């Protein structure tokens, strides 16, 4: 009986901890709407990506040319289990290597020696104020 009470108490505490983590707001705020792309002056070439960080299971932050930071939102939990040191894999779609819309970005992440392909839902250029507000560990 005593073991059952201890097990129930531990399970309750664990579920409260999970709920607290799930309720924690992202420092990024809500993601851009699905299908959101970039205005023509903010497009970039895939070979200009210099660094990245994985903000959460659906958000990748990329440094482009050492000047700009872009927020890429992916479908599902494509980035779950990935860490910042896991390489991202981009392929140029046929016709152009310029990324302006989600469909322009063919993205994957190499986790534990296996590639996971991601469906890009939105791309947004972050403002200097948004980048400055990021915690240090999230800055690409």
Report each predicted region and the residues it spans.
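Positively charged n-region of N-terminal signal peptides that target proteins for export
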Residues: 1-4
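Bacterial N-terminal signal peptides
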Residues: 7-15
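Short, functionally important structural connectors and interaction interfaces within domains
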Residues: 8, 35-36, 41, 110, ...
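Cleavable N-terminal export/targeting peptides
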Residues: 18-19
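N-terminal secretory signal peptides
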Residues: 22-82, 137-140
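Helix-rich interaction surfaces within compact, conserved domain-sized segments
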Residues: 76-140
